[in-house]
């Protein structure tokens, strides 16, 4: 092989080209590649964090739904218990009112019965006195009649 000046010039030119590329072209290219790699790595990490956050949010949402269902069930159970309690209280009050009304009615009935008996006794006594008066054909004065009526009424 023959080494001449052209080959030597080409080697020097190539070396200068490589040095120029290494000094001025290569660092910005490497920096751009590194920035791009960093952005991709950050994007992947962000995607992983987002996936973890999504899983965590879904787990929290599921827990909150379970808690809300449990709370709703408790509220419904308390409402049903309160409803039963109110119904029982209303039944008890109605039963007490019923007993009160029945007792009042019985008392009124007994009072009316006693009034009717007294009235009947007075009428019987008056009839007895009138009959006795007719039998005796004489008039009894009012005081004597009242004494006789009271006496007969007490015996009846």
UniProtKB/Swiss-Prot annotation:
Primary location group: membrane
Alphabetized GO MF terms: proton-transporting ATP synthase activity, rotational mechanism; proton-transporting ATPase activity, rotational mechanism
Transmembrane segments: 7-29
Membrane topology listed for this record: Single-pass membrane protein
Record carries keyword Transport: yes
Family matches, as InterPro entries: ATP_synth_B-like_membr_sf (IPR028987), ATP_synth_b/b'su_bac/chlpt (IPR002146), ATP_synth_F0_bsu_bac (IPR005864), ATP_synthase_B_chain (IPR050059)
Keyword Ion transport: yes
CDD domains referenced in this protein's UniProt entry, alphabetically: ATP-synt_Fo_b
Disulfide bonds: none
SUPFAM superfamilies per UniProt: F1F0 ATP synthase subunit B, membrane domain
Family assignment from sequence similarity: Belongs to the ATPase B chain family.
Functional summary from the UniProt entry: F(1)F(0) ATP synthase produces ATP from ADP in the presence of a proton or sodium gradient. F-type ATPases consist of two structural domains, F(1) containing the extramembraneous catalytic core and F(0) containing the membrane proton channel, linked together by a central stalk and a peripheral stalk. During catalysis, ATP synthesis in the catalytic domain of F(1) is coupled via a rotary mechanism of the central stalk subunits to proton translocation. Component of the F(0) channel, it forms part of the peripheral stalk, linking F(1) to F(0).
Subunit structure: F-type ATPases have 2 components, F(1) - the catalytic core - and F(0) - the membrane proton channel. F(1) has five subunits: alpha(3), beta(3), gamma(1), delta(1), epsilon(1). F(0) has three main subunits: a(1), b(2) and c(10-14). The alpha and beta chains form an alternating ring which encloses part of the gamma chain. F(1) is attached to F(0) by a central stalk formed by the gamma and epsilon chains, while a peripheral stalk is formed by the delta and b chains.
Protein name: ATP synthase subunit b 1
Gene giving rise to this polypeptide: atpF1
């Amino acid at each position: 092989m023959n080494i001449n000046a052209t080959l030597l010039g080409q080697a020097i030119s190539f070396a200068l080209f490589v040095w120029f590329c290494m000094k001025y072209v290569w660092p910005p290219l490497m920096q751009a590649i590194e920035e791009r790699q960093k952005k991709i790595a950050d994007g992947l990490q962000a995607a992983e964090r987002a996936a973890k956050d999504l899983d965590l949010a879904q787990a929290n949402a599921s827990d909150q739904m379970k808690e809300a269902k449990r709370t709703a069930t408790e509220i419904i159970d308390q409402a049903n218990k309160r409803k039963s309690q109110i119904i029982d209280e209303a039944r008890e009050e109605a039963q007490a009112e019923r007993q009160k009304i029945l007792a009042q009615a019985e008392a009124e009935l007994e009072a009316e019965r006693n009034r009717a008996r007294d009235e009947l006794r007075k009428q019987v006594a008056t009839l007895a006195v009138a009959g006795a008066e007719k039998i005796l054909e004489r008039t009894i004065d009012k005081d004597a009649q009242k004494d006789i009526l009271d006496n007969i009424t007490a015996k009846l």
